[in-house]
Amino acid sequence: MKRTQNKYDLVVVGGGHAGIEAALIAHKRGVKTLLVSMDKKSVGRTSCNPAVGGLAKGQMVKEVDVLGGIMGFFADLSTLQSKTLNKSKGRSVWSPRSQIDKKLYEKIAQKYIKEQGLDVLEGEVVSLNIKKDSICGVFLKDGSEVVCSAAVLTCGTFLNGLIHIGSKQINAGRYGEKSCLLYTSPSPRDNTLSRMPSSA
């Protein structure tokens, strides 16, 4: 098994909104950080509905902004249309929302990450190296290991993602992209990471 030359303080798994925020804020604070994504070209790619804002997400974007995050900045630079939702109701439920250009948002995010000097590695993390209840590294699908002191998992909907077409189930993320099959130990049977059960 080959190991990376560099030891990182933090490895962030996944290059969506959460992964970018976690990696950039750690990097800005002087933490030696590596962002791992299954596809470098998909870092910053948004979901099917490329909207930033709304009642719940809008509040979150503002809080991320206050804490030094970057999502709102990327959204401002890639906005196609802005609108205040619920104008016919009381002010307490008014909420700004922007429809963004998906491709432009992605391009801006990748350019900014490069300018900041954040290390990005293309690969798929399949398990965590845990010794004495501490993370020592992450194992990639190609058999290599990235040594680190901590890891943040931001796999989102890609973590063990399934697409249902009729009675068929396919492991997948967004259309045309594969899902992330991540385990907490080298043996998939030992302790599979999965989504939390929905409370019905």
Residue ranges and their predicted role:
Residues 183, 190-200:
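Single conserved hydrophobic/aromatic residue that forms the stacking wall/gate
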Residues 6-16:
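Beta1/beta-strand and adjacent pyrophosphate-binding region of the FAD-binding site
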Residues 19:
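N-terminal Rossmann-fold NAD(P) dinucleotide-binding loop
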Residues 7, 24-131, 150, 154-178, ...:
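Conserved N-terminal/central alpha/beta ligand/cofactor-binding core
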Residues 130-144:
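Conserved beta-strand-loop-beta-strand element in the redox core of flavoprotein oxidoreductases
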Residues 9, 136, 149:
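Conserved acidic residues
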Residues 13-14, 123, 141:
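Short His-Asn-centered micro-motif
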Residues 2-4, 145:
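Short, flexible hinge/linker loops that cap or flank conserved catalytic cores
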